[in-house]
Amino acid sequence: MSGGDVALAPLPQADGRPKPRPVVLLCQMPPFDDWLVCGVSTQLHQEVPGFDETIGPSHADFRRSGLKAASLIRLGFLAVLPAAQLHGRLGSIAPERHERLLERLGAFLQSRHKA
């Protein structure tokens, strides 16, 4: 798998129990090459404008993402997971979307570091 891929992975829910959810692989983390991932949700009303990103049937990369419904890529729903916990590649998002997510997350972290 590589950055920008969409896979299934167990992520903790509000009740603390893990549930298989789609995730976008953002990047591998040192020293063990675990994956920094962000959760994907169909709860579009949870969008943080200018931070999260929606993907749906009108987007060129929706079909190849493997997602079944319009979804929200939630940059505020992060996890670091070993590759062994990634269960099956569903598809991938466009390289431009992947890069935009990384830049947006990096800018957010930089702004918090300076504060």
What are these regions (language model features)?
Residues 1-115:
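Conserved functional hotspots at enzyme active or ligand-binding sites that engage polyanionic ligands
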